[in-house]
């Protein structure tokens, strides 16, 4: 079939999207599809013209970050009447808003860390939570802008002064322990991965995610079966609660000392290089990377 692959974009995650998109293009061509790459820039009219010229049967969305996974490009594709992979407008917009995601997940009985959305002015005045706590942009991905304020740390006011991610921030209690993630394909939770940042990484930040040697992935995670089952259940329920479609990935923190497992976020546009977390989990389940990409476009077309 004719597939247009959207990649690039204008967010801070553009380099990640380019890698994901190029890998998907190669995989889809391997599966026999007629693929047209479309590098999405700041001019949406140019993107629309490229989509109309390509006249695809389906669009593979390999964009990340604002405008790519927040419902914006999804709205354009809906307006054009083009089927597309991953989640729709509402789920994409909600999942991109970490504050809104927290509210919906908690209402569904799913575990989230103690926290709230604060203004930058509030953050500048006083600690919003007892340290240690995490400060996150409300609408960024790939751990862009994430800061950890630890006990005795005097960086809070400076973080607020130099904040460049809007007028608000999400603050959450820091959960010690392990970084876990679980992917979902349709109505199936795949596997749980244990993410081990390098010894030089403070946490699983942008460099740990994308720099060579920045982290190591262990799939399946070496966990008690009950914890694995809980993570898989939470990932599928989070996918369903937000109304996600296609593939998603839910990230967790797990404190072994207290047996506490909390959801950090739900990714409606998970990384899609062959060595990204979701494709690794699919491979563990016997689904090759080309088969995963092929499933995504066929699932989108069948909705």
Curated annotation (Swiss-Prot):
Q: Residues that bind Mg(2+) 2, according to the entry?
A: 265, 267
InterPro entries under this entry?
Answer: ATP-grasp, ATP_grasp_subdomain_1, D-Ala_lig_Van_CS, D_ala_D_ala, Dala_Dala_lig_C, Dala_Dala_lig_N, PreATP-grasp_dom_sf
PROSITE patterns, per the entry = ATP_GRASP, DALA_DALA_LIGASE_1, DALA_DALA_LIGASE_2
Which BP terms in the Gene Ontology apply to this protein?
Answer: cell wall organization; peptidoglycan biosynthetic process; regulation of cell shape
**What are the binding positions for Mg(2+) 1 in this chain?**
251, 265
Superkingdom field = Bacteria
Q: What is its main location?
A: cytoplasm
> Keywords assigned by UniProt?
ATP-binding, Cell shape, Cell wall biogenesis/degradation, Cytoplasm, Ligase, Magnesium, Manganese, Metal-binding, Nucleotide-binding, Peptidoglycan synthesis
The UniProt entry's GO CC annotations, sorted and at most eight, read:
cytoplasm
Q: Which cofactor does it need?
A: Mg(2+); Mn(2+)
Q: Where does ATP bind?
A: 128-181
Pathway per its UniProt entry is: Cell wall biogenesis; peptidoglycan biosynthesis
Keyword Ligase on entry: yes
Q: Does the keyword Manganese apply?
A: yes
* Boundaries of every ATP-grasp domain copy: 102-298
| Pfam families linked | Dala_Dala_lig_C, Dala_Dala_lig_N
The cellular location(s) given in this protein's UniProt record come to:
Cytoplasm
Reactions it catalyzes: 2 D-alanine + ATP = D-alanyl-D-alanine + ADP + phosphate + H(+)
Q: How is the cofactor bound?
A: Binds 2 magnesium or manganese ions per subunit.
- MF terms (GO), sorted A to Z: ATP binding; D-alanine-D-alanine ligase activity; metal ion binding
EC number(s)? 6.3.2.4
Name the family: Belongs to the D-alanine--D-alanine ligase family.
Q: What does this protein do?
A: Cell wall formation.
Question: In its UniProt entry, what is this protein called?
Answer: D-alanine--D-alanine ligase
Q: Which organism is it from?
A: Gluconobacter oxydans (strain 621H)
> Lineage in the entry?
Bacteria, Pseudomonadati, Pseudomonadota, Alphaproteobacteria, Acetobacterales
């Amino acid at each position: 079939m004719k597939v247009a692959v959207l990649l690039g974009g204008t967010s801070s995650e553009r380099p990640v999207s380019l890698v994901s998109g190029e890998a998907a293009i190669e995989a889809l061509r391997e599966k026999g599809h007629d693929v047209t790459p479309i590098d999405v820039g700041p001019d949406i009219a140019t993107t629309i013209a490229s989509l109309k010229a390509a006249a695809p049967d389906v669009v593979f969305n390999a964009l990340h970050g604002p405008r790519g996974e927040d419902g914006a490009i999804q709205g354009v594709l809906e307006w054009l009447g083009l089927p597309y992979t991953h989640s729709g407008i509402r789920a994409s917009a909600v999942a991109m808003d970490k504050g809104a995601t927290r509210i919906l997940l908690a209402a569904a009985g799913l575990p989230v860390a103690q926290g709230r959305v604060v203004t930058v002015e509030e953050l500048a005045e006083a600690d919003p939570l007892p340290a240690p706590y995490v400060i996150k942009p409300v609408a960024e991905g790939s751990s862009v802008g994430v800061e950890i304020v630890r006990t005795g740390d005097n960086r809070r006011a400076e973080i607020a002064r130099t904040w460049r991610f809007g007028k608000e921030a999400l603050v959450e209690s820091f959960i010690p322990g392990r970084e876990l993630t679980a992917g979902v394909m349709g109505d199936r939770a795949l596997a749980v991965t244990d993410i081990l940042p390098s010894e030089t990484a403070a946490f699983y930040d942008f460099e740990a995610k994308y720099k060579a040697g920045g982290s190591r992935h262990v799939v399946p995670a070496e966990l008690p079966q009950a914890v694995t089952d809980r993570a898989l259940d939470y990932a599928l329920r989070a996918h369903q609660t937000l109304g996600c479609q296609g593939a998603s990935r839910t990230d967790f923190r797990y404190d072994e000392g207290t047996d506490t497992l909390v959801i950090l976020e739900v990714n409606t546009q998970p990384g899609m290089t062959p060595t990204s977390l979701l494709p690794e989990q699919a491979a563990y389940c016997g689904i090759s990377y080309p088969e995963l990409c092929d499933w995504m476009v066929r699932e989108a077309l069948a909705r």
